[in-house]
């Protein structure tokens, strides 16, 4: 087990609060992000180049701005929340933080970070484990936002029929209540919140974590749970999973809180699927069967 200083407290008090990172409305996309950049330009450093291409577009739009990356969030994103994370993690050697405060505009919230030069072979899961350990060690004890799991759920179910919405809202409440009793072997402290190889980039001779939107104070095991789910689903073989665990110094499979974290992830997946179907104009004919599973959340 890694020698981590345990976070204060022995139980989690997950927050129910307005969503700081809402999902975008249907129709929002690259054109809005470019318009947001133009509106934000007077507030950005002069060295930030005009976007030359799109690096990614889904719940946010990521633009190639030469030596910088411009990430644009949909309208309604809490710029203060983003700034709180990047200010607290300022100077990090394990993660890439924003260069300037977030700039809210009518078309979206604009952030800028340095561009991590692409190159080299894909990051391995062993490197992810090592990068995550460095991140936890470096950022332990920092005043990051309280964890707010499933914060996107209320907005996404608000237009469902009342009975359907109530099933998912009740499931969320049950899971949040159960989380208050979770005990952690690794401590309650700073987590990355969205661990995957796609959020770890090669940076010179080392690697760096990116996409810090979900940084929060939570059981550190939460950051290990995604790898364990990939292993248990067959997406990751045993040798790869073991390499991740060895690099971090801990295997989460024996943790009593893991089944609950799985259910939180499952419900978050339902919320995302509802949004994705609406965003792309697909129907929700799968939802009634899914709701039957959530009448008994645990």
Name what the model sees in each region.
Residues 220-252, 265-281:
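Active-site activation/catalytic loop segments of kinase-like enzymes and analogous catalytic loops
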Residues 75, 118, 207, 215-217, ...:
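Activation segment
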